[in-house]
Amino acid sequence: NKIVSLEMAEHVGIRHYAKFLRNVYDLLDDDGVMVFQVAGLRPRWQYWDLIWGLFMNKYIFPGADASCPLNWVIGQLERAGFEVRSCDVAGIHYSATIDRWLKNWKANEAKVKAKYGERLYRIWHFFLASSILIAREGGSSVFQIVVTKNLNATHRIEGVASHGGMLPRPNRGKWYQSVL
């Protein structure tokens, strides 16, 4: 009834994105809900964005596509048949998470270097530190998107704390019966 995909799509890659989403769509119940979290970059507009993408492709996620802007991701979800119910752009929060990862990375420097060497330690140190900066300045982000499979199978205001006093499951009392 529910599926959660946490940053899996980046590793699927652009060439397999549509197939991945079709498979997820087929697995989800008709009244199901999916939380789809995906990292992405804004559309490239400065030189740093190109350098970042090349670095990521060579050293961090070879063959993965963590560089898709939000409009592309939403389009893919909609073409797969999903209805987007909500979207949160959480890059600034994600940068705080990555900051903690970097602190853990540095705290375990000796262990990492002993097991993987100086080069890998430095590459990932650069990656984590740069990820914090690029997320804080808006160049990259993480998108948390809630989608449904069937527009009519779920109440559209469920999950909204207050929507003008409307209740997700209407009281089926006299008023409800008189309207229908």
Cite the ranges covered by each PLM segment.
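Short conserved loop adjoining the S-adenosyl-L-methionine
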Residues: N1
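A conserved beta-strand element that flanks and buttresses the S-adenosyl-L-methionine
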Residues: V4-A9
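Short amphipathic alpha-helical segments
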Residues: H16-Y17, W48
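A short glycine-rich, Lys/Arg-flanked "PGG" loop and its adjoining helix->strand segment in the class I
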Residues: A18-V33
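Alpha/beta-hydrolase-fold catalytic nucleophile elbow
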Residues: Q37
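Substrate-binding/catalytic lobe of Class I Rossmann-like enzymes that use SAM or dcSAM, i.e.
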Residues: G40-I157
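Short, cationic low-complexity segments
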Residues: V160-L180
